[in-house]
Amino acid sequence: MPETHPVPERIEAALDLIERAQPELNAFITVTGERALADARVAGSELAAGVSRGPLHGVAVGIKDLIATEGVRTTAGSRILGRWVPKRDAAAVWMLRVAGAIVVGKTNTHEFAFGTTNDNPHYGAVKNPWNPALTSGGSSGGSAAAVAAGLLDVALGTDTAGSIRIPAALCGAVGLKPTFGLISAQGVVPLAPTLDTVGPIGRSVDHVAMAMAALVPEGVGGRVWGVGEGDGRSNTLPPKPYTPSFPGLTIGVPEHYVFDRVDPEIETAVREALRAMEAAGAVIRPIELPELERCWEVGISIVRPEALAFHQRWFPARAADYGADVASALEAARDIPAKQYLTARRRRREIARALRRSLEDVDLLAGPTVPILAFPNADAFRPVLTGGELPRHAVTRLTYPFSLSRLPAISVPCALSGAGLPIGLQLAAGPRQEAQLLAAARAFEDLRGPWQAPPLAARIA
C-alpha cells in the first residue's frame, strides 16, 4: 500500500477548531475549507512521496484579509471591497503556497487596516482570547488572535505603525515586522505605502522563522533562519543549527522613552526580562534617543495623507460606507497640508538616522511593545491615560519608531499581568538583521520558559 500522510487530517482538525472558536473569537472573515482540504490532499501526497517544499509544507496558515488571495474574496475589512475577488495571489501569499503552506482562510482586520483595535463595524470585533471583553489590538487582530488561541501556528499580517506587533503583544503571540521592503507588498491593499510592511505572526519564534524561510527564499537554510526542511508530519519543529544565546550581545534601552507613561505592571515585567537577559550574559545599556519623542506626530502626518491619497477614489463620495473611526481619520487627513507631510517625511529620515546610529553601538534595542494592557473597545476613544492620550493612539507610541525607521522589530510574550493579560517585549535590530533578531528572541523564549495557552483554548479543545 502507498504511504499515507496526516496532512489532510491536520487541516481538518484546524478547520474544526476555527469553526468552534469563531462565535467567541471572530478571528476570520472568510474560511476556505474546501480549497484547504483539496490543497492538503496534494501536500499529503507530495510528502508521502518524499517531496518536501520546506518547513511550512502542509501547515495551516491564515492570511490577513487585506492581502489578495486568488479566487477568494478580499474585503480589507470593509464594505467597499466586500465583493472583491482578486484574480491572483499577493506576492507573499504566492510564496507561502510555493512553500506548501495550506491557506485555511482570511483573518479579520481593522477596516482598511486603519486602526489599532480591530473593532470592525462590518464584520464584527475580534475578541481577545485571554478575555473576550477586551480588544485583540489591530489591525492584524484576527491573525494574532487565531495564532494565540492555538487555531494556527502561523498567520500573515501587515504592519504600518505597529499592526503586527500590537495585537501580538495584546493577544500573547510572536509578531515580526521585517525590514521595510524585505517582503513584497505587491497585492496588499495599501494604507501608507512608504511604511506598509508584510510579516508573520507565530505561536513561537521558531514558527515565525519557518514563515520567514518561505517568505524570503534567499533566507532558506539553517544558517540564516535556523530551520531545516521539516516533514509536515506534526507540529514538531525541525532541529536548529544555531544555539540562541546572550553572551556578547549588547542591548540598548532608551529608558526615558520606552518607560514613560507605561503601565506599572508592564514596566516591571519588561525590566525583569531585561535583568534575566543580563544574567544570561547580555550587556544592558541605557541610551538616549530624544528624536523618538516626535514619532507619533510624524507618523500620523505620513499615514493619514498617504491613506487619503488611496481612498480619494471613494472618499468622501462614499463616506457612509466607512466605519465612523476610519471616516473621521480620512476627514482629518484632508486638513493636513502638503508642507506638514513633507516635513514629516524629512523628520522620518532623521528618526531613522538616529536609530541606525544607536545600533552602531549596540546590537539590539529593547523595551515594551505597547505601554498599556488590553482594554475594552469602548475605551478606545476615552482619554484615560496621562495627558489625555487615547488608548487607540497610545498603543502605537512604542511601535512607531521602528515603523518610521523601517527597521525590523519583534514582539515576544514576556509575562502575564495580575489580571492574566499578556505583556509583550519588543526587540529591534539593524536593517536586514532579522536572523540576529530571531536568535535573540528565541534565546529570550528559552529564559522565559513555556508560554501558557489562553483560557479560550481550553474552552474549544
Annotate each PLM feature.
Residues 1-160, 275, 280, 357:
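Gly/Ser-rich catalytic/binding loops embedded in alpha/beta enzyme cores
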Residues 1-4, 62, 81-85, 196-203, ...:
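Short, well-ordered beta-strand elements within core beta-sheets of diverse protein domains
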Residues 79, 83, 342-343, 374-396:
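Short, surface-exposed loop/helix-turn segments at secondary-structure junctions
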Residues 14, 36, 208, 251, ...:
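Residue-level signal for inorganic ion chemistry
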Residues 356, 388-413:
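Small-aliphatic-rich amphipathic alpha-helix that forms the alpha element of a beta-alpha
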Residues 20, 24, 98, 149-226, ...:
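Structural helix-boundary/capping segments
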Residues 9-11, 41, 264-288, 312-317, ...:
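Acyltransferase
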Residues 57-76, 248, 252, 302-356, ...:
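Short helix-loop capping/hinge segments that flank enzyme active sites or metal/cofactor-binding pockets
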